[in-house]
């Protein structure tokens, strides 16, 4: 507080838009998914949630938004650690999984791992296309002035644009 940094950040977001629905998409979804992909291990909850609280979001609203966005990016968080380390290490020596991969026509484990990653990305991208809209609807229903899902849905164009800005590159890279 004494340095005034939070006031500067708050003013910066207000200059972008005073609309909390857009702010939650920018902070929780776009920033949150970015830092999950780069740092992983729940970093969005540790960084984006306090940022939203500092900007004046109710604490519970910030926590709910931070947790909802954790649905899509987690499988490739920390530069793919859950897939590259978790799935690979956890399944590569399992005789049943090796037999299953062979049954599906994969002669190399790495090809099967890529297949798993692609399937996960497709499922998460399909669901992720609607996560920003869900976040805004939940925010306005439980924390908005009118307690209305409809208020959250009014920003659907930006919500879908933001979702696709994350999910399309997500699919391409996966």
Predicted regions and their residues:
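Membrane-core helix-loop-helix motifs of multi-pass transport proteins
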Residues: 55, 61-174
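Membrane-embedded alpha-helical segments and adjacent helix-loop junctions characteristic
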Residues: 1-55
């Amino acid at each position: 507080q004494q340095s005034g940094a939070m006031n500067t950040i708050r003013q910066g977001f207000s200059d972008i838009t005073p609309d909390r629905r857009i702010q939650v998409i920018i902070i929780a979804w776009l920033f949150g998914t970015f830092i999950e992909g780069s740092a992983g291990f729940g970093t969005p909850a540790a960084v984006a949630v306090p940022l939203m609280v500092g900007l004046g979001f109710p604490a519970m609203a910030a926590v709910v938004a931070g947790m909802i966005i954790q649905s899509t990016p987690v499988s490739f968080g920390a530069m793919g650690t859950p897939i590259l380390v978790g799935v690979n290490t956890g399944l590569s020596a399992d005789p049943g999984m090796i037999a299953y991969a062979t049954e599906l026509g994969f002669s190399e484990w790495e090809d099967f791992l890529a297949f798993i990653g692609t399937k996960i990305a497709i499922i998460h991208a399909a669901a992720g296309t609607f996560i920003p809209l869900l976040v805004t609807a939940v925010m306005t229903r439980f924390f908005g002035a009118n307690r209305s899902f409809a208020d959250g849905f009014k920003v659907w164009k930006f919500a879908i644009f933001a979702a696709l800005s994350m999910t399309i590159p997500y699919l391409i890279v996966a």
